[in-house]
């Protein structure tokens, strides 16, 4: 059901590594003969089933399986996990909210025509901000009622960054703009040198940061878009930007990992790779976990760029740090528990034939598995 969805394609793109022999790497946004064969293989793949023993070795146990409502023939485009809820957006413009404790549907509604495209929604307090190409919905998370609906007059391409009463979007035309939600107008606009495909992030009380796919990096004053620091690299990114309030951390398609000073743009460090870095990196308590083809999974001192350890035999997305001693890592075809201090494999279990993985917290987080059949399964710490 999900093999054609944005959720699956994003998962495939961000977890494709030459060192990881995963079938996810065959998925792309352009349909070819080989893609059609891969789609046929995916369609005939056996349904995913829960390996309770394997999850137990990772220190997790199954808690529930839920089913976000979708329109007939629709697929899940976006999924986000929070402490208390999960949000889903289907290709039929259906937004659904499930209770994190039980998996029950809190509410579900179709916002627009089934052909309308939505970016990933974001939450602030009890409001969900869901944006289509040109409109922004503010929805009550309690019952799904519409609080406000605004036309933005611009084709957006990223999730919104919500700061006070501003919703900040990026576009394929390279425009980063702030929409003033209370009075329904575009407050400011800033032109980058190429398409913006990742959402802006807040780096301080006064500034946000964004990157174009041509490698232009800038911080802008949130209230007026006055330029702060700027930097330039040779490519954009397939992953979200990260910050600790000191550095801006980028996994770049120009085959490098970077850290830049958010104040003046000084490059703290750079780690090169022989391939574009496409796996989402993770920042936790002064350590950056990232994967490249050359070094596999790495633990990097975020301040200095020193590689504290690396394991060239594995690579993937670090979902959560558990018990302050282990990393839970999804490689694209298996889930692993990794020793946080040395990078050694503690436990592993196969995890194939799924559409995506989400967690609700970088520290001791729950793990949610989204299946091709349209279900979501929650696994909590034992």
Question: Where do the language-model regions lie?
Answer:
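Repeat-blade elements of multi-bladed beta-propeller folds
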Residues: 30-44, 70-93, 113-137, 150-177, ...
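Beta-propeller domains
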Residues: 90-102
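Short loop/turn segments that connect beta-strands within beta-propeller blades
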Residues: 99-102, 140-144, 180-184, 221-225, ...
């Amino acid at each position: 059901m999900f093999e054609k969805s944005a959720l699956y394609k994003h998962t495939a793109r961000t977890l494709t590594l030459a060192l990881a022999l995963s079938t996810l790497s065959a998925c792309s946004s352009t349909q070819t003969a080989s893609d059609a064969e891969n789609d046929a293989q995916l369609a005939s793949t056996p349904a995913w089933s829960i390996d309770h023993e394997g999850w137990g070795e990772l220190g997790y146990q199954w808690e529930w399986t839920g089913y976000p409502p979708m329109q007939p023939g629709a697929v899940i485009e976006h999924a986000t996990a929070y402490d208390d809820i999960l949000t889903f957006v289907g290709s039929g413009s259906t937004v659904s909210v499930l209770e994190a404790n039980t998996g029950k549907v809190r509410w579900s509604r179709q916002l627009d025509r089934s052909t309308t495209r939505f970016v990933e929604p974001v939450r602030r307090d009890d409001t969900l901000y869901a944006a289509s190409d040109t409109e922004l919905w503010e929805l009550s998370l309690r019952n799904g009622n519409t609080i406000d609906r605004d036309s933005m007059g611009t084709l957006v391409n990223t999730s919104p960054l919500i700061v006070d009463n501003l919703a900040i979007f990026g576009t394929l035309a390279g425009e980063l703009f702030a929409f003033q939600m209370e009075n329904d107008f575009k407050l400011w606009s800033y032109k980058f040198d190429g398409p913006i495909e990742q959402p802006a992030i807040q780096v301080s009380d006064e500034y946000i940061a964004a990157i174009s796919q041509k490698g232009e990096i800038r911080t802008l004053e949130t209230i007026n878009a006055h330029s702060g620091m700027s930097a330039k690299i040779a490519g954009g990114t397939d992953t979200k930007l990260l910050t600790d309030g000191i550095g801006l951390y980028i996994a770049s398609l120009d085959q490098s990992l970077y850290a830049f000073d958010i104040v003046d743009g000084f490059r703290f460090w750079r780690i090169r790779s022989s391939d574009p870095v496409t796996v989402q990196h993770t920042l936790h308590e002064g350590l950056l976990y990232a994967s490249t083809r050359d070094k596999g999974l790495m633990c990097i001192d975020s301040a200095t760029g020193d590689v504290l350890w690396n394991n060239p035999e594995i690579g993937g997305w670090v979902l959560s740090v558990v018990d302050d001693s282990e990393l839970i890592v999804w490689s694209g075809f298996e889930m692993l528990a990794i020793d946080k201090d040395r990078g050694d494999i503690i436990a592993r279990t196969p995890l194939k034939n799924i559409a995506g993985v989400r967690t609700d917290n970088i520290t001791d987080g729950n793990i949610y598995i989204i299946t091709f059949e349209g279900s979501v399964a929650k696994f909590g710490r034992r």
